[in-house]
Amino acid sequence: MTMDEQQSQAVAPVYVGGFLARYDQSPDEAELLLPRDVVEHWLHAQGQGQPSLSVALPLNINHDDTAVVGHVAAMQSVRDGLFCLGCVTSPRFLEIVRRASEKSELVSRGPVSPLQPDKVVEFLSGSYAGLSLSSRRCDDVEAATSLSGSETTPFKHVALCSVGRRRGTLAVYGRDPEWVTQRFPDLTAADRDGLRAQWQRCGSTAVDASGDPFRSDSYGLLGNSVDALYIRERLPKLRYDKQLVGVTERESYVKASVSPEAACVIKAASAERSGDSRSQAATPAAGARVPSSSPSPPVEPPSPVQPPALPASPSVLPAESPPSLSPSEPAEAASMSHPLSAAVPAATAPPGATVAGASPAVSSLAWPHDGVYLPKDAFFSLLGASRSAAPVMYPGAVAAPPSASPAPLPLPSYPASYGAPVVGYDQLAARHFADYVDPHYPGWGRRYEPAPSLHPSYPVPPPPSPAYYRRRDSPGGMDEPPSGWERYDGGHRGQSQKQHRHGGSGGHNKRRKETAAASSSSSDEDLSFPGEAEHGRARKRLKSHVNSDGGSGGHAGSNQQQQQRYDELRDAIHELKRDLFAARQSSTLLSAALPSAASSSPTTTTVCTPTSELTSGGGETPTALLSGGAKVAERAQAGVVNASCRLATASGSEAATAGPSTAGSSSCPASVVLAAAAAQAAAASQSPPKDMVDLNRRIFVAALNKLE
């Protein structure tokens, strides 16, 4: 295509089609709602009885009245929504779009393979991918249907924008209106026929420059483009609209789903194109020899993307490959804009290569557009090779010494003693930066000055007195370990040994007594029950023989074992006391239930009847009188334990042979004898003890029986 054909195609009208509203998609804002009945009523009212427009609506950019680029050729309400077909005819606007499309990398990639490249159409598809309708609000149906008021026209204009606010308002551009309508599968054949009749009646002739309605400029379009950059949901909404409309099923110039990031990838140029461009752009300096062979490829970067070949610098030309190198090992040559890099080709080039003049041009100091990737070691090796040639190329340049400064000696792990010679900070600094050798001290000196000595007039302080230990008990007790000794400083040397031994002024013993009194409390007292001999007296519990400091070693283990034994004994004694208390309570209840008044002592519950009552029973036998004792014996056999003995059932003959007691006596030897016999029989019938706790329990019960 020639230049004239491209210019004529650029000024040719461009058609754009798309939905202005979708009836099946509810908008996010209520003011954007366009019901079907309201739209059809407006079309009949504005089309003078026909469902079309009698007057063409203006087509502008981003609702800017000064940026009118064409007109609406057809508008019709179809099954899925309100569809329109516009025509872009502004020559000034199309010329701006043509010039901008030549600088776009995304447009230069071209469309999908079956489509013909058209930069103007592709630029419009990527920049203004949405349609927006400016109309009256239809929040109220009655107000929307009535055209009375200041605004009698329901539709004002249609705008080409970056993204529409309504769903499904995607714009499709093309040179043929029939091709544009075929991109939408939702349009039926009848819909396309109606749209065709409208645009043929409206006309689509090109507008001349004198009647161009576009009164804006490129700066206004640039401002609108900057505003479109702040739309956060632009790309997701365009992808959604593209799928909703169904444009993805057919070829189009829509760039909604194409990411511009892929266009930023650096393309690798071929050797022929790069060689031609370098031969045309580069101008060799005077006296420089142009190599006949093609330059070697640059160093491969770490990324998989191949960088383009670097253009030759005016002052430095790439060197020829030596004939001894194999094809698998090409020569590596790179040109850099750093002043020291001018001598790199001279140092690394083969003998047959020549270098440009002595001073570089000013233009060679500018950074090139493309860069070359070098490893760190290769970069430093190039700098090292250029040091020798830098003073020659640049008079007055000072080259750094090749050898690095020696590392300082390591610091000592501990400070030197006071007997070592004193080393000042000046000597240390000289030792850092020069080959300083101390003749007196080969290693490092200390960092601090020695401690200042006292004035000769001051007396010498006495040496510190050593601490000694003293026993807290009498000299006769030798079994206490040294850990129990008390330590006294030398300040107590003026007091007498006797005063130390007996507590001095009494402060130490006083503190010990206060500590003991604070540690002893009512919680250490053991429990006592009514009826016991020691009831009402404070009895201390058994304390564990554990050291106050917790003990250590074997002492801690033995103390722990003793503590466990004492805990077991204490638990057994408490169980016995609870059993005895329960037995006393039950015996008290039984004695209260007997027919005769019984005198009870605090240590026994055996019922005794006087002799006068036994003889004056009126024919009653002692067995009958002892019926209460028999009941007690039965309950004792059932599990009721008495504190004094276990009662057994006595026969009538044994009670008769016991004989009456003296009158007025409150004792009953017959019952005591029977109780003792029953206790012996019960003890004989018991099983042997099971363990040590059971044996201790029986011994304790026997001791209590003897006391009673």
Swiss-Prot record:
Gene, per the UniProt record: UL80
Residue interval(s) of motif Nuclear localization signal 2: 537-543
Record: active site: 63 (charge relay system), 132 (charge relay system), 157 (charge relay system)
Site (Cleavage): 143-144, 209-210, 275-276, 643-644
UniProt entry tagged with the keyword Protein transport: no
Region of interest (Interaction with pAP), residue spans: 333-352
Residue ranges, compositional bias (Pro residues): 294-311
Record-listed E.C. numbers: 3.4.21.97
Record text about domains: Region of interaction between pPR and pAP is called Amino conserved domain (ACD). The region of interaction with major capsid protein is called carboxyl conserved domain (CCD).
Organism expressing this protein natively: Human cytomegalovirus (strain Merlin)
InterPro entries: Herpes_virus_sf, Peptidase_S21
A Pfam family of this chain: Peptidase_S21
EC class of the enzyme, as a word: hydrolase
Name assigned to this protein: Capsid scaffolding protein
